[in-house]
Regions:
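Selected transmembrane alpha-helices and immediately adjacent juxtamembrane segments
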Residues: 3, 147-181, 213
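Hydrophobic/small/kink-forming positions within alpha-helical transmembrane segments
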Residues: 18, 22, 49, 73-78, ...
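Membrane-interface interhelical linkers
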Residues: 1-19, 24-34, 39-71, 80-90, ...
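Hydrophobic transmembrane alpha-helices of multi-pass small-molecule transport proteins
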Residues: 48, 108-111, 121-138, 264-281
């Protein structure tokens, strides 16, 4: 039973994140990266608060934990800005698989900070994903600045990987419901103040709001489903299934957005996805 539950929750997370990234592309094309970030994250924030009200879990924080929560929130903000800005200038079918490579960062941090040992398949996964990053960066007649979207995606991958590494510690130090909600409260505050500092106008056409709301619901839905899955089943099982969400995105982008990518970039995407599977085993 736990295995079947893990498969179900892993699939829900995979579908949620895959469709979320697809809709994000359409939202950014219409509302811009910053407004998409604000309204989509605000939606997920509201959903997480409702979830916390239904399943309340409190914890007494220390100064050290508060500092870690603030660092995590800053990294999440950085990750989203880089991710969404990358989508503005590059195909989502290239950006999303790169960002999904964040497990590499988690494992590297685990090695250097927690002194965890690499397995053979993890080393192979590193090589595959680095090769994939090189391949998706290849463009015919590339000009200076042409790879800005790829650089943004790599920045997002590093930020999200570091944030999730810290989040893993915070879950163990508190509990996953409190860590999820409190982290989102801090991130929402940072997003609001950052956009206020940048003097970003938040007004958007009403026709765009359904896209922004759907992104937020799918993103938080995937996060909650993943968290449930790893609590009732094998972490490796849920991680492998959910990590394949770029497959959904790439298929949708190819069918509906008609994104054009080179054969080298296609091979790079496949190599990154293969590395994702290996690194999650």
């Amino acid at each position: 039973m736990p295995l079947s539950q893990g498969i179900i929750f892993g699939l829900i997370a995979m579908l949620s994140w895959g469709f979320s990234d697809f809709i994000v592309k359409m939202a950014i094309d219409r509302a811009g990266a910053y407004r998409t970030l604000f309204y989509s994250y605000l939606t997920g924030f509201i959903v997480s608060i409702i979830f916390f009200i239904i399943f309340p879990q409190f914890f007494r924080l220390t100064a050290f934990l508060v500092i870690l929560f603030l660092i995590e929130a800053f990294l999440v903000l950085l990750g989203y800005i880089a991710f969404y800005r990358g989508i503005e200038v590059e195909n989502i079918s290239i950006v999303s698989p790169i960002v999904a490579g964040y497990p590499v960062v988690i494992i590297l941090l685990s090695y250097f900070i927690l002194r965890e040992v690499f397995t053979l398949h993890q080393i192979i996964a590193f090589i595959l994903m680095i090769l994939g990053l090189v391949l998706v960066s290849i463009k015919k007649k590339a000009k200076i600045g042409d790879n800005k979207g790829v650089y943004m995606a790599i920045t997002a991958m590093l930020a999200f990987g570091s944030a999730i590494f810290i989040f893993g510690y915070l879950i163990k130090a508190t509990n996953w419901i409190f860590a999820l909600v409190f982290g989102r409260i801090l991130t929402m505050l940072l997003i609001f103040n950052y956009l206020k500092f940048r003097k970003i106008q938040l007004k958007v056409p009403k026709s765009i709001l359904p896209f922004l709301i759907m992104v937020g619901i799918l993103e938080i839905g995937g996060a909650i489903s993943y968290s449930f899955g790893v609590n009732v089943s094998l972490v490796s099982l849920v991680s492998v299934i959910s990590s394949l969400y770029p497959l959904i995105l790439v298929m949708l982008a190819g069918i509906f957005l008609k994104e054009r990518i080179s054969n080298a970039q296609k091979l790079g995407i496949f190599t990154i996805l293969l590395g994702l599977v290996l690194i999650s085993l």
